[in-house]
């Protein structure tokens, strides 16, 4: 541990992703766990964060006081829920620190509040923090631009574990936005997220989404470009959620030297 290590806070510390973040921060170079936060009625308040994450004691108790933690830290890693993320965005803006957001399912109003907080904080937000998925997004945009809507249909298929509460996934939407950008269209106008009953022929130029849920699947995503007589499939499989945690740590370290503003993983990876 070095005095120059970036001091990070993990919020939602008791969740699956929170525990993964704690382990990743503990093992990564250039960062250290400053605090771990849970909701005020959590039975884990007071527990050692390292013990909860399977590391053994690390001397960082779980607390329910985010602002106190934020003002002494340099960054926060947030894979919680939209309401919590909006609250943490305001606190991160007060503390003027880096806020890395992997939370999905945010509404347009949530997004507006997060972007407002980015006037004072350095916000890095992405539907997926992994290098592979963000590269897949770039490839999807390129393919969508090269293959015309007249002859090629785009469908996005995703599968996640049974506990995931939002659909389509943030990653599927990220890929949909990439495809829409390649086509020069607005995803909100062209997305088809539900098909049921007699739907009629597929409208030209739309981008379809299909969602699967079951088991303990970390994340499977495929972008399918279907033409006449040929099929192009671009896919990514996540086998360990630590890939998202490593990406979040990389985003925090990158954001440390940036000006306040709203960024994505494409900025972090130099792909924008």
From Swiss-Prot:
NAD(+) binds at residues 12-17, 38, 102-104, 126-129. (S)-2,3,4,5-tetrahydrodipicolinate binds at residues 161, 170-171. InterPro entries: DapB_C (IPR022663), DapB_N (IPR000846), DapB_N_CS (IPR022664), DHDPR_bac (IPR023940), NAD(P)-bd_dom_sf (IPR036291). It comes from the Bacteria. One of its GO terms (biological process) is lysine biosynthetic process via diaminopimelate. Belongs to the DapB family. This is 4-hydroxy-tetrahydrodipicolinate reductase. The gene is dapB.
